[in-house]
């Protein structure tokens, strides 16, 4: 699906319709020293079963693509769409 790189939509902080930049959401780095991560690694050591079950078959064919829009006036970022797509392409719109 082709989606424009810039859209005009409502900004809750500016309380008006403004131009927004569109980008694809990317997850941040996982913290290796977080308690859950340390607990998971400790449980995985040695012999025995997996802490979480391995998934044998998958129910979904695609992942949900989340877009993040940034207001060009105030700089506020917010998630925009979570749509199921195989491919997402951000394109410049020629007017």
UniProtKB/Swiss-Prot annotation:
<dbReference type="InterPro" id="IPR053708">
    <property type="entry name" value="Ribosomal_LSU_eL42"/>
</dbReference>
<dbReference type="GO" id="GO:0003735">
    <property type="term" value="F:structural constituent of ribosome"/>
</dbReference>
<dbReference type="GO" id="GO:0006412">
    <property type="term" value="P:translation"/>
</dbReference>
<feature type="binding site">
    <location>
        <position position="14"/>
    </location>
    <ligand>
        <name>Zn(2+)</name>
    </ligand>
</feature>
<keyword id="KW-0689">Ribosomal protein</keyword>
<feature type="binding site">
    <location>
        <position position="74"/>
    </location>
    <ligand>
        <name>Zn(2+)</name>
    </ligand>
</feature>
<dbReference type="GO" id="GO:1990904">
    <property type="term" value="C:ribonucleoprotein complex"/>
</dbReference>
<keyword id="KW-0687">Ribonucleoprotein</keyword>
<comment type="similarity">
    <text>Belongs to the eukaryotic ribosomal protein eL42 family.</text>
</comment>
<dbReference type="InterPro" id="IPR011332">
    <property type="entry name" value="Ribosomal_zn-bd"/>
</dbReference>
<dbReference type="Pfam" id="PF00935">
    <property type="entry name" value="Ribosomal_L44"/>
</dbReference>
<keyword id="KW-0863">Zinc-finger</keyword>
<keyword id="KW-0862">Zinc</keyword>
<dbReference type="GO" id="GO:0008270">
    <property type="term" value="F:zinc ion binding"/>
</dbReference>
<feature type="binding site">
    <location>
        <position position="71"/>
    </location>
    <ligand>
        <name>Zn(2+)</name>
    </ligand>
</feature>
<comment type="subunit">
    <text>Part of the 50S ribosomal subunit.</text>
</comment>
<dbReference type="GO" id="GO:0005840">
    <property type="term" value="C:ribosome"/>
</dbReference>
<comment type="function">
    <text>Binds to the 23S rRNA.</text>
</comment>
<dbReference type="InterPro" id="IPR000552">
    <property type="entry name" value="Ribosomal_eL44"/>
</dbReference>
<dbReference type="GO" id="GO:0070180">
    <property type="term" value="F:large ribosomal subunit rRNA binding"/>
</dbReference>
<keyword id="KW-0699">rRNA-binding</keyword>
<feature type="binding site">
    <location>
        <position position="11"/>
    </location>
    <ligand>
        <name>Zn(2+)</name>
    </ligand>
</feature>
<feature type="zinc finger region" description="C4-type">
    <location>
        <begin position="11"/>
        <end position="74"/>
    </location>
</feature>
<keyword id="KW-0694">RNA-binding</keyword>
<keyword id="KW-0479">Metal-binding</keyword>
<protein>
    <recommendedName>
        <fullName>Large ribosomal subunit protein eL42</fullName>
    </recommendedName>
</protein>
């Amino acid at each position: 699906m082709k989606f424009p790189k810039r859209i005009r939509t409502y900004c809750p902080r500016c309380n008006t319709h403004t131009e927004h930049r569109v980008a694809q959401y990317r997850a941040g780095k996982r913290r290796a020293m977080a308690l859950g991560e340390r607990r998971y690694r400790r449980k995985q050591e040695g012999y025995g079963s997996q802490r979480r079950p391995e998934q044998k078959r998958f129910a979904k064919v695609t992942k949900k693509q989340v877009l993040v829009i940034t207001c060009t006036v105030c700089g506020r970022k917010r998630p925009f769409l979570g749509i199921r797509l195989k491919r997402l392409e951000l394109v410049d719109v020629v007017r």
